[in-house]
């Protein structure tokens, strides 16, 4: 474990701040400029559409009656704390894992603020093909998905990267 935070993954916490600010500023812009369900087409397959998500990804548990708000709040806080502890234990040079953890934390905190402030998450990125729409999402959701993808990728390539840096042939 690194002896000070500058040598640890906490050095990457600027990504958390960047994701959080981009997410919150974009949602504030949507709330200030759109009515609920208002939509503006930007591309033939992409709209800005203001929707409220009372559940999790893909509106999971959105009609559960309200208790899910507190479950998702607890999960967001728990994962953010856990990943922050892991960041402190990681060397700063482990860029892929540090980037992944900070993307997930930034996204989790962005959606957490929405849940606490509004009781729902503001979603507005609406991709579709013909009449089939992918569930709307936001910058926080994107960061969480990219972070999760990097964690999965790291699980496949981390051992190979270690062997390369140690000069070991497979």
From Swiss-Prot:
The chain crosses the membrane at residues 12-32, 67-87, 94-113, 139-159. It holds the Pfam family Peptidase_A8. Keywords: Aspartyl protease, Cell inner membrane, Cell membrane, Hydrolase, Membrane, Protease, Transmembrane, Transmembrane helix. The active site is at residues 123, 141. Its EC number is 3.4.23.36. InterPro entries: Peptidase_A8. Its main location: membrane. It catalyses: Release of signal peptides from bacterial membrane prolipoproteins. Hydrolyzes -Xaa-Yaa-Zaa-|-(S,diacylglyceryl)Cys-, in which Xaa is hydrophobic (preferably Leu), and Yaa (Ala or Ser) and Zaa (Gly or Ala) have small, neutral side chains. GO terms for molecular function: aspartic-type endopeptidase activity. Pathway: Protein modification; lipoprotein biosynthesis (signal peptide cleavage). It is an enzyme of class 3 (hydrolase). HAMAP family: LspA (MF_00161). This is Lipoprotein signal peptidase. The gene is lspA.
